[in-house]
């Protein structure tokens, strides 16, 4: 059953999820105040008592930006005009792999320094920072051609980042097969029966760590010391523990793209995660994307039951939503505060994969929530 609000079809489950009893921002028109969406207060999430501090002008005004695939239907200039009109201050730009490179002609910019300068100037003329380049792929894929293609995309992205003076590259850790003979990735999260432990150990020792040691060395030579891995299911780095495992094995060039949408359903406390990683200087980038949980389906099917399409929602345990449509604005205020408290130096990059809201609307709604909670924290 769907209802109409603000001209949009909204699935009934949009109203079901709560955070500490607070209403979702989804249940409030976009023009309503964040204070109302937050249920009248900005209480920290569970497990964060004692961390609350009064807003201070010393807190950094973290730039709010957007990841460009949501605007794949627009030209570069059209996209930049749209982003500027929204008052966003930064962008994450795809350079290949899963995000593609629709707004960034990588080879052309590498071949011609003048074209690279002109490309970047389009952003600068609108007051938009090119904050990160993103090449999400699988450079340790068991298919050699697939792995080589994604590894080459990473290499070119490093060279382009050097040319553009961009300091952060975002991507995935990748996932190998479970043995030399496998032809597809094998995501192993449970070390039993014993052969799974053997396969997982082989993946890390023979594929993941050797590749990223060499890749980090290459990046370091070209002045890039921040490789931000999205902790994403189906890749070997999928939570804070596996991220730190790779960082400890490879070096401090490895850090997080902290996309909480992949951690909510795993049961992580978002503020706890930010403090845990942030205190170690291990957060290099942050995706702003929400997840809504449908308790009646979690009770029946468990959490490994994610939906990406609207047709799957009636049986889904979770799906992605725009910021504020899965958790209350007060929770997101605690999240932004945690980034400020831990000295995070990156941007808040809106990524829209909401199956209900269109891309443009999802970005606008997320930007509205994030701007308001940031302003409340800064007292502006």
List each language-model region with its residue ranges.
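Glycine-rich, proline-tolerant flexible connector loops at the mouths of alpha/beta enzymes
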Residues: 94-118
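Active-site acidic/histidine proton-transfer and metal-coordination neighborhood
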Residues: 14, 19-32, 51-58, 78, ...
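Catalytic domains of carbohydrate-active enzymes, especially glycoside hydrolases
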Residues: 79-97
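Short, acidic/polar
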Residues: 73-83, 149-158, 268-276, 332
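N-terminal secretory signal peptides
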Residues: 1-11, 36
């Amino acid at each position: 059953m769907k209802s109409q609000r603000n001209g949009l079809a909204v699935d009934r489950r949009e109203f079901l999820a709560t955070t500490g009893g607070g209403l979702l921002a989804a249940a409030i028109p976009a023009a309503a105040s964040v204070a109302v969406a937050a249920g009248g207060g900005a209480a920290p999430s569970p497990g964060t008592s004692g961390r609350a501090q009064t807003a201070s002008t010393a807190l950094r005004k973290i730039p709010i930006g957007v990841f460009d695939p949501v605007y794949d239907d627009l030209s570069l200039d059209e996209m930049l005009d749209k982003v500027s009109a929204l008052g966003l201050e930064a962008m994450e730009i795809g350079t290949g792999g899963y995000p593609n490179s629709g707004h960034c002609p990588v080879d052309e910019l590498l071949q011609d320094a003048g074209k690279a300068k002109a490309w970047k100037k389009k952003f600068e003329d609108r007051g938009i920072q090119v904050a990160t380049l993103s090449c999400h792929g699988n450079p340790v894929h068991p298919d050699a051609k697939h792995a080589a293609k994604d590894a080459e995309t990473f290499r070119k992205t490093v060279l382009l980042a050097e040319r553009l003076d961009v300091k952060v590259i975002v991507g995935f850790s990748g996932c190998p097969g479970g043995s030399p003979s496998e032809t597809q990735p094998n995501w192993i999260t449970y070390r039993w029966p014993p052969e799974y432990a053997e396969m997982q150990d082989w993946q890390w020792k023979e594929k993941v760590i050797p590749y990223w040691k060499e890749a980090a060395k290459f990046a370091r030579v070209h002045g890039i010391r921040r490789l931000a891995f999205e902790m994403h299911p189906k890749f070997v780095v999928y939570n804070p523990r596996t991220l730190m495992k790779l960082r400890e094995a490879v070096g401090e060039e490895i850090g997080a793209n902290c996309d909480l949408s992949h951690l909510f359903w795993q049961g992580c406390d978002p503020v706890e995660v930010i403090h845990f990683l942030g205190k170690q200087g291990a957060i290099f980038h942050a995706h702003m994307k929400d997840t809504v949980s449908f308790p009646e389906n979690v009770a029946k099917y468990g959490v490994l039951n994610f939906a990406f399409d609207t047709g799957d929602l009636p049986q889904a345990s979770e799906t992605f939503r725009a910021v504020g449509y899965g958790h209350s604005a007060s929770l997101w205020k605690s999240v932004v505060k945690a980034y400020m408290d831990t000295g995070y130096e990156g941007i808040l990059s809106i990524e829209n994969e909401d199956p209900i809201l269109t891309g443009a609307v999802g970005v606008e709604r997320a930007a509205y929530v994030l701007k308001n909670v940031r302003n409340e924290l800064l007292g502006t």
